[in-house]
């Protein structure tokens, strides 16, 4: 068999490279759509094809979601997608490293590790940080034991830490370093008007009014039916300077006496207290 000329060999090789279709190559054919996720099959001049993927998809058949669609790369890193695998890697900016570029080669969070006692360091900028402390610790670098952990503030007060000490913000009516002391409002005269008697209560006080006066400070004249004490639509009728009776609606007559008696007991008790 005569040897083939070099020129003929090159011509045959070029023809094969141009027109041969590998057995595994993607092909676009009528009635067959290899591309998924709304990808479009495009044919090359040699008969092979490829899938032109819509935004958000990649891969030979557009079968992968674009892993860079939600860029996980931190600190200015660039997401680089591997289309065939549907995976991505981060190309980090100068000064950062790690799978997601989350580590700085010079930031205090990773060089000096300033957060103590198990605290977590968060980068705020290239050289500033903030520590999230474990329960029981406080301070810029979680260096102090939380003085509020023992709940030193009493009577519903609010505890705040200042350095390694605590400070209590007391509710009205209490005082002291730990808000443990009740303020006796009755030590200051003038709270109760028209001869009312001041009664000290925990964190507050109450005025016991003389007959004929009412209100928080005994500052209002008492009128038995203003406002009406009668319930369920009953009508109040004043029977004396400081007494009343309730006239009930017909549908509540059967239980009206019971309601009236209960209200009268409450009123009589209140009237008795005010005497």
Swiss-Prot record:
Q: Does the keyword NAD apply?
A: no
Where is the protein localized?
Secreted
Q: List the disulfide bonds.
A: 28-41, 35-51, 53-62, 68-79, 73-90, 92-101, 109-121, 115-131, 133-142, 148-159, 153-168, 170-179, 186-198, 192-207, 209-218, 225-236, 230-246
Q: Which Pfam families match?
A: EGF (PF00008), EGF_CA (PF07645)
Using the record, list the residue span of the signal peptide; answer none if the entry has no such feature: 1-25
Source domain of life is Eukaryota
Provide the GO MF annotations for this entry.
Answer: calcium ion binding; Notch binding
Task: Name a GO CC annotation attached to this entry.
Answer: extracellular region
**Keyword Calcium attached:** yes
Q: What is its main location?
A: secreted
Check the record and name the InterPro entries matching this protein: EGF-like_Ca-bd_dom, EGF-like_dom, EGF-type_Asp/Asn_hydroxyl_site, EGF_Ca-bd_CS, NOTCH1_EGF-like
Entry keyword set: Calcium, Disulfide bond, EGF-like domain, Glycoprotein, Notch signaling pathway, Repeat, Secreted, Signal
Residues carrying covalently attached carbohydrate according to the record: 46, 155
Tissue specificity as recorded in UniProt: Expressed in radial glia neural stem cells during cortical development.
Q: Name one GO biological process term.
A: Notch signaling pathway
Every EGF-like domain range: 26-63, 64-102, 105-143, 144-180, 182-219, 221-258
Under the subunit heading, UniProt states: Interacts with NOTCH2. Interacts with DLL1; the interaction is direct.
| Function (record text) | Human-specific protein that promotes neural progenitor proliferation and evolutionary expansion of the brain neocortex by regulating the Notch signaling pathway. Able to promote neural progenitor self-renewal, possibly by down-regulating neuronal differentiation genes, thereby delaying the differentiation of neuronal progenitors and leading to an overall final increase in neuronal production. Acts by enhancing the Notch signaling pathway via two different mechanisms that probably work in parallel to reach the same effect.
Q: Which disease is it linked to?
A: Defects in NOTCH2NLB may be a cause of chromosome 1q21.1 deletion/duplication syndrome. Deletions of NOTCH2NL (NOTCH2NLA, NOTCH2NLB and/or NOTCH2NLC) are present in patients affected by microcephaly, whereas macrocephaly is observed in patients with NOTCH2NL duplications.
Additional note from the record? NOTCH2NLA, NOTCH2NLB and NOTCH2NLC paralogs arose between 4 and 3 million years ago, after the separation of hominids from the chimpanzee and during the early stages of the expansion of the human cortex.
| Family to which this protein belongs | Belongs to the NOTCH family.
Protein name stated in the entry? Notch homolog 2 N-terminal-like protein B
Which gene is this protein's source? Answer: NOTCH2NLB
